[in-house]
Design a protein with these regions (language model features):
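A general marker of short, structured functional hotspots
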Residues: 48, 56, 74-76, 137, ...
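Generic beta-strand/beta-sheet core signal
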Residues: 7-9, 47, 78, 131, ...
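Structural beta-strand/beta-sheet cores of well-ordered domains, especially the beta-sheet scaffolds
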Residues: 2, 42, 73-76, 124-126, ...
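Conserved non-cysteine loop/helix-boundary elements of the Radical SAM core domain that shape
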Residues: 1-73, 84-98
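Mobile beta-alpha loop/short-helix "lid" or hinge segments that flank ligand
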Residues: 78-84
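Terminal RNA-binding accessory module
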Residues: 82, 89-172
């Protein structure tokens, strides 16, 4: 299935270093571009943390930009929550209101990216593995619903008629 989920966490190099991540922003972008060049149909998902200690507005904007630079369609957003007795707990904290605001901005971006992805798939026929009678997943991990019950565990060629905020809507 041409879907890859990346644990990026942030789009800012200093924040990544403070998180003790082993990759840089530039490495993430290079990996995504190289993979997309080799497999254009590949979609990316990513985990992102909003409000890690010391994250400034400019650092946060680096994360927003990274979503476009890596062509990420699926975002899993986590507001930072501290753990006692960790290195991050001893760093200057971002206030809770700002963490909430940044989390919302990332969730809004996630919805926008999802809608763009769905729009690209409208009117296409996709191979769908049914996970339940009315829901399945396309090869790129996109959820698809049907109005007709289909056999769980089977793969169907379904044409995408429309979409809503959460999934594609297909006919068989």
């Amino acid at each position: 299935m041409p879907h890859l989920h990346l644990s990026l966490q942030s789009g800012n190099n200093l924040i990544l270093k403070r998180m003790k991540r082993r990759h840089s922003r530039e490495q993430a972008i290079d990996v995504c571009r190289n993979l997309k060049a080799a497999r254009p149909e590949l979609t990316f998902g990513a985990d992102l943390i909003a409000g890690f200690p010391t994250e400034s507005d400019t650092m946060f904007l680096d994360t927003i930009k990274l979503v476009d630079e890596c062509d990420i369609s699926w975002l899993h957003i986590f507001p930072y929550s501290g753990r006692p007795n960790t290195p991050a707990s001893r760093m200057p904290q971002v206030n809770k209101h700002e963490i909430s605001k940044r989390s919302k901005a990332l969730r809004d971006l996630a919805q926008q990216k999802r809608m763009q992805h769905f729009a690209k798939l409208k009117e296409k026929t996709l191979s769908v593995l049914m996970e339940s009678e009315f829901k399945g997943r396309a090869e790129d991990f996109t959820e698809i619903t049907t109005s007709t019950p289909l056999k769980t565990g089977e793969i169907y060629a379904l044409k995408v008629d429309s979409y809503n905020a959460d999934s594609l809507i297909a006919r068989d």
